[in-house]
Amino acid sequence: MELKQFDGQKKSELSLIEVAHAILSQHGDVMAFADLTNAVQSYLGKSDEEIRERLSQFYTDLNIDGSFISLGDNMWGLRAWYPFESIDEAVIHTDDDEDEDRPKRKKVNAFLADAGDDDDVIDYDDDDPEDDDNYDDDDDQDDDTDDSASSKYDELAGVDDTDDDVADETLPDGIEGQLSELNDDDDDDDYDDEDDESK
């Protein structure tokens, strides 16, 4: 295989990525990784041992280099062949082919599985026999409890708030009696004294 763009250059100075790019450009179609590696090896004249040593780095460089694109199934092509919008379509299209081969599962509805067996089926549209029960007796009991609760509150209605106010005005002579009351005039005097000292 001859690559015209490398005429006059030493093959030992060429990188595997440069050669792979030139091979894909000349080939014009996607290639499997193994075929691409074999083509690079045959062009550079490298031994199997030398290629095996550099194989992992070559694969990493293919992934990192922005000019290559993996199309799935270890097929590689040049990114320049695919416009930006069609990249996802080209990559995803191979997955769609595999999905068509698989038979689709049938959906099972758990409620309709045994439609012929009516013993276990609950019909929620039927009237419930408890709906016909008379609940008027329960309403009478609620009325009685309301009357007893209101009678408890009636006892509190006679309590007057004025009795508490008188008790609050007369304080026992404890700690409160020992406190002195401050007047506004006393506060002003303290501030005036501080102002005089700072001058």
Curated annotation (Swiss-Prot):
Transmembrane intervals: none
Occurrences of domain HTH HARE-type (ranges): 14-81
GO molecular function, one term: DNA-directed RNA polymerase activity
GO BP: DNA-templated transcription; regulation of DNA-templated transcription
Domain of life of the source: Bacteria
Residue ranges, compositional bias (Acidic residues): 116-147, 157-171, 182-199
Region (Disordered): 116-199
Record keyword Transcription present: yes
Keywords, in A-Z order: DNA-directed RNA polymerase, Nucleotidyltransferase, Transcription, Transferase
Record bears the keyword Nucleotidyltransferase: yes
GO cellular component terms, A-Z: DNA-directed RNA polymerase complex
Function: Participates in both the initiation and recycling phases of transcription. In the presence of the delta subunit, RNAP displays an increased specificity of transcription, a decreased affinity for nucleic acids, and an increased efficiency of RNA synthesis because of enhanced recycling.
NCBIfam families, A to Z: RNAP_delt_lowGC (TIGR04567)
Subunit and interaction comment: RNAP is composed of a core of 2 alpha, a beta and a beta' subunits. The core is associated with a delta subunit and one of several sigma factors.
Family statement drawn from the similarity comment of this UniProt entry: Belongs to the RpoE family.
Descriptive protein name: Probable DNA-directed RNA polymerase subunit delta
UniProt organism field: Lactiplantibacillus plantarum (strain ATCC BAA-793 / NCIMB 8826 / WCFS1) (Lactobacillus plantarum)
